[in-house]
Swiss-Prot record:
Any Pfam family matching the protein: TrbL
Gene: virB6
Family assignment from sequence similarity: Belongs to the TrbL/VirB6 family.
Compartments in which it is found: Membrane
GO biological process: protein secretion by the type IV secretion system
Phylogenetic placement of the source organism: Bacteria, Pseudomonadati, Pseudomonadota, Alphaproteobacteria, Hyphomicrobiales
Keywords tagged on the record: Crown gall tumor, Membrane, Plasmid, Transmembrane, Transmembrane helix
GO cellular component entries: membrane
Transmembrane intervals: 35-55, 68-88, 167-187, 201-221, 226-246, 251-271
Protein name: Protein VirB6
Amino acid sequence: MNFTIPAPFTAIHTIFDVAFTTGLDSMLETIQEAVSAPLIACVTLWIIVQGILVIRGEVDTRSGITRVITVTIVVALIVGQANYQDYVVSIFEKTVPIFVQQFSVTGLPLQTVPAQLDTIFAVTQAVFQKIASEIGPMNDQDILAFQGAQWVLYGTLWSAFGVYDAVGILTKVLLAIGPLILVGYIFDRTRDIAAKWIGQLITYGLLLLLLNLVATIVILTEATALTLMLGVITFAGTTAAKIIGLYELDMFFLTGDALIVALPAIAGNIGGSYWSGATQSASSLYRRFAQVERG
C-alpha cells in the first residue's frame, strides 16, 4: 500500500521547521541591524548623562554603576549577533532540550515523536482500508460509522502532533523577536514586557519537559498496544463488530490525547504562577519600603 506522503508527520515537521528556521533567522538579523546603530547612540548618550548625574551627586554612585553595567550587558546581547546566539538562542534551542532529554522515563527521544506517529498512522491505515473494502457501497450506516471512527483517530494524532510541533516553532518565533523585546528591559516602563517574554520562554521550556515525560510515555504505550488491539479488531466476526472495535481504539487514543493536550495549560499555569508570584513579591517589597519611609 503506497501513501501519497509515506511519512506525513515527519514531512510536515521538517517543512515547517526549515521554513521557520530560515525565515526567522533572516528576520533576526534584520532586527539586530535595524536597532543596532540608534540603540548604541542612545545608550552612549545615556551613559554620558548618567555619569554627569553621578558626578553631581544627583544619582547614587552604586546605583548608577549598576544601571550602566545592566544596560551594557543588555545592549551587548541585542546588537551582537554572536552574543545573542551564544547566550540566548543556544540556551533555549540546544541546552534546554538536551537537559530535558535526561529526564526521559521511556528512553524514547522526544525528537522521534513524528516518526512514531507516522508508524501508528501507517499501521492503522492498513487496517482501516482493509475494513473499508468489506463495507458495501450501499451500506450508508456502516460507511458513516466507519468514517466517524477514522476522523476521530486522525484528530487525536494531529492534535498530539500539533502540541509537539508548536513548542519548537513558537520558541523560534519568540527568540526571533527577542532583540526588540530586550530593548524594553532598558526602560523601567517597559521592563515588564521583557520579563513576560522571558517567562513565556520558560513556560515553553516547562512544556518541553512535560512533553518529554508524558508524551513519550503515551505514544510508546499506544504503539505497544496498537498491534494487539488491531489484531483483535481484524479478526472480529462481522464488519459491524470491527467498526465498534475501531471506536474502542479511538477511545484508547483519546485518553492519551487528553493527557498531551492538557500539558500546555499545566505549563502555562506553572510559568504564570511563578511570574505572578515574583511580581507580587516585588510589589509587597515596595510597599514595605514605602511604609518605612513614611514611618
